[in-house]
From Swiss-Prot:
Reported function: Plant non-specific lipid-transfer proteins transfer phospholipids as well as galactolipids across membranes. May play a role in wax or cutin deposition in the cell walls of expanding epidermal cells and certain secretory tissues.
GO biological process: lipid transport
Signal peptide feature range: 1-31
SUPFAM superfamilies linked to this entry: Bifunctional inhibitor/lipid-transfer protein/seed storage 2S albumin
Domain of life according to the entry: Eukaryota
Disulfide bonds: 35-83, 45-60, 61-106, 81-121
Lineage of the species this protein comes from: Eukaryota, Viridiplantae, Streptophyta, Embryophyta, Tracheophyta
InterPro entries noted in UniProt: Bifun_inhib/LTP/seed_sf, Bifunc_inhib/LTP/seed_store, Plant_nsLTP
Protein's name according to its UniProt entry: Probable non-specific lipid-transfer protein 2
Gene Ontology MF annotations: lipid binding
Swiss-Prot/TrEMBL keywords: Allergen, Disulfide bond, Lipid-binding, Signal, Transport
Family listed: Belongs to the plant LTP family.
Disulfide bond found in the keyword field: yes
Length: 133
């Protein structure tokens, strides 16, 4: 069984939340609402996970790493997960195989479970996400 860094899951899954520049423009600024910081860090990953760029941008990787440093406790991870799940409902166009590539391409050691809009955030435990691989 593989284990998953929830911080990396949070970062990558949050990138799924926005599918157009109009949606990005309406995303909360850092500090606005519970998802503002998550959104701020992962917005640069959108083009890569949609297949519009061949590699994640430097800002995608730096945001991913920064968020993984900030989301530490089980409760923080669960709250970030809830934000992501709410934001991803009804979103299409995300390529899950590219989502799984972001940690590797950004130098973050992790694997990712399937990411869906009905993901059960209560499964998140401490520093490890278990049971999906």
């Amino acid at each position: 069984m593989r284990t998953v860094s929830m911080a990396a899951l949070v970062v990558i899954a949050a990138a799924l939340a926005w599918t157009s520049s109009a949606e990005l423009a309406s995303a909360p600024a850092p500090g606005e609402g519970p998802c503002g910081k998550v959104v701020h860090h992962i917005m640069p990953c959108l083009k890569f996970v949609k297949g519009e760029e061949k590699e994640p941008s430097k800002s995608c990787c730096s945001g991913t790493k920064k968020l993984s440093e900030e989301v530490k406790t089980t409760e923080q991870k669960r709250e970030a997960c809830k934000c992501i799940v709410a934001a991803t409902k009804g979103i299409s166009g995300i390529k899950n195989e590219l989502v799984a590539e972001v940690p590797k391409k950004c130098g973050i050691t992790t694997t990712l479970p399937p990411i869906t809009a009905d993901f059960d955030c209560s499964k998140i435990e401490s520093t490890i996400f278990r049971g999906y691989y």
